[in-house]
Amino acid sequence: MELDECLERLYKAQLLPEVTVRALCFKLKEMLVKESNVIHIQTPVTVVGDMHGQFHDMLEIFQIGGPVPDTNYLFLGDYVDRGLYSVETIMLLIVLKLRYPSRIHLLRGNHESRQITQSYGFYTECLNKYGGNSRVWQYLTDIFDYLVLCCIIDDEIFCVHGGLSPNVQTIDQIKIIDRFREIPHDGAMADLVWSDPEENNNPTLDHPDNSGQHFQVSPRGAGYTFGRSVVEKFLRMNDMNRIYRAHQLCNEGYQIYFDGLVTTVWSAPNYCYRCGNKASILELYSKDQFYFNVFEEAPENKLLKENSMNDNALEDSISNPVANRKLIADYFEDDSASADGSTDPEMYIFSDVYQARSASNRHVDYFL
């Protein structure tokens, strides 16, 4: 099947045959293996945050931000899980990358992981859509191992899914990471996709710990939280001026930290079809000219919830019943959770960490 024919089908949310998925994944591996852990691109570019299988919202992005290849896009990761159309979402991005390799750039997020996707929807979705076998999931999660970790725009803007790491002081240290594997539980690679900036909630983040670093172990169970001093040091050492990242739900679609040194971009509106948040894409015209294009959910999502599914069925579809569905429901009943969109701890993948922390803190999340 030709790439343009694949695109025509995918834009209509039609599944591709398994044999085609396999062939496309093989071609993309051949392309991605040639890319460095850190890619360099130039403005103008539009930066996209978490999508989480919200396929119709991704189509909305191509409407408001411009179609490919007219617009140059950088996606910051987390393409799958939670939304009902993770397969269609990642497949469209794969084919667009193959068709327009210089106009679509894909970073790896913490959900581009075999372990995570077995618990938070993507694995089950692949089984349901491809006759109960896991081969398509295997093809796609193999692709995840080839996705790049970071991007630098105009030699001055550092882009990553999550955040910084106490194991990384320079860009050169990122370039030598062995990325062609499952995301480990700890270390530099894990930190890049799991860590978060934290501005107001913990002032001790700007004071060094015993090792002389300005990091604290993240409540997510992986990665770290880090303060302004970490950001300033990293930017100074690498001659950068700011950081763009995703990974955290923002009620207004984006959030700015440390007087503009760090910006979070969130691109999944009404996350999980019920959070009510806005989303944004960051249109970067030059290093000093940019615009947050804020948008709301696509009409198809409203129809999906109103006409196709009741709340229980929707919840069944966006979460693996084995993966603490009751806790997810409890989260949504807690009106105080993420009220300002700035704090949203993960539902911890490491069960022992999760059990200890959830017992003392009901403010759990649905795995961003």
From Swiss-Prot:
BP term (GO), one: asymmetric protein localization to old mitotic spindle pole body
Annotated cofactor note: Binds 2 manganese ions per subunit.
UniProt modification remark: Reversibly methyl esterified on Leu-368 by leucine carboxyl methyltransferase 1 (PPM1) and protein phosphatase methylesterase 1 (PPE1). Carboxyl methylation influences the affinity of the catalytic subunit for the different regulatory subunits, thereby modulating the PP2A holoenzyme's substrate specificity, enzyme activity and cellular localization.
Active site: 111
Sequence similarity: Belongs to the PPP phosphatase family. PP-2A subfamily.
Role played: Involved in glycogen accumulation.
Protein name, UniProt field: Serine/threonine-protein phosphatase PP2A-like PPG1
Species, as recorded: Saccharomyces cerevisiae (strain ATCC 204508 / S288c)
